[in-house]
């Protein structure tokens, strides 16, 4: 019983608060994975986040990616976060890169429409997402 109580306390203290903030899901294509989660922040700064997963699994809402964001940024206190979803899996090699480019173009328009800073946009990803971010940057 004590273990259950401690586990519950851990959950309350360390559960991801980004999930408690209302997010907006945006579509940049027709495929079910061509979605962007937008988490509004209090400033005009923008973070474009690309999840990892070896190009074959995972997703933009997977807890481990969200927790890594929370560890390094004041998530939803300051930054406006656009978390890109993309097609992945076997035999989808060019699709992830194509989707990321398409999503970034879509986000650029959203930044303008929402009156966010076009000069203060940070692009980052982890693992496969880091690779896709580098492809966008070049």
Regions found by a protein language model. Name each.
Residues 19-42:
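N-terminal cap/lid segment of alpha/beta-hydrolase-fold proteins
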Residues 125, 129, 133:
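Gly/Ala-rich beta-loop-alpha elbow adjacent to hydrolase catalytic centers
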Residues 92-111:
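Alpha/beta-hydrolase active-site loop
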Residues 54-57, 61-62, 81, 106:
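Serine-hydrolase catalytic-loop signature spanning alpha/beta hydrolases and amidase-signature enzymes
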Residues 44-54:
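Short beta-strand element of the alpha/beta-hydrolase
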Residues 108-123:
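Gly/Ser-rich "nucleophile elbow"/oxyanion-hole loop immediately N-terminal to the catalytic nucleophile
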């Amino acid at each position: 019983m004590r273990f259950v109580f401690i586990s519950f306390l851990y959950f309350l203290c360390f559960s991801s608060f980004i999930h408690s903030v209302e997010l907006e899901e945006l579509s940049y294509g027709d495929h079910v994975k061509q979605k962007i989660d937008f988490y509004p922040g209090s400033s005009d700064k923008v973070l474009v986040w690309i999840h990892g997963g070896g190009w074959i699994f995972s997703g933009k809402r997977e807890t481990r990616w969200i927790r890594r964001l929370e560890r390094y940024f004041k998530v939803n206190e300051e930054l406006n976060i656009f978390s890109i979803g993309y097609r992945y899996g076997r035999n989808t090699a060019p699709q992830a890169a194509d989707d990321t480019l398409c999503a970034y173009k879509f986000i650029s328009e959203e930044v303008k429409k929402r009156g966010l800073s076009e000069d203060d946009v940070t692009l980052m990803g982890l693992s496969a997402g880091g690779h896709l971010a580098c492809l966008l940057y070049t």
